[in-house]
Amino acid sequence: MLKYVNHDIVFQEFPDEVTLAVNLSQCPNACPGCHSPYLWSDTGELLGLSRLKSLAAQYADEITCVALMGGDNDPESVLLILSELKKAMPGIHTGWYSGRTALPECFGEYPAPDYVKTGPWREECGPLSSPHTNQRLYRYHEDGSREDITYRFRKK
């Protein structure tokens, strides 16, 4: 079961995308130094496909991507809802920010989101823009291949 607390339009989560970022609660990772500890608790509204489609439709003229931020408590629901959204809105890209170091076993059972960020927040490693980051951002292609695009966050 997925619950969301809030959402916002963001510009830096995925390269070249204007993203509707939906913040999910019930995060089991509880990373030290997390910038959103309010997402650890069981709070917010249920997020089903109809609600996610409604949010995406509300901003359809402004966004190119819809991302779920969190969802590690129920990764199968994340993958299912993003694949269903993509079917319903074929022009939209999808993304998932996971705090886990590895993808869940169920990942191969669903079409991959266009973008997947993995890795818990570790202050000593820094964000995606840090050369020492433990986090990775992957771009999944239609043929099933993936590309590590973490380098796109680093200044030249």
PLM features per residue range, with description:
Residues F107-K156:
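Classical nucleotidyltransferase
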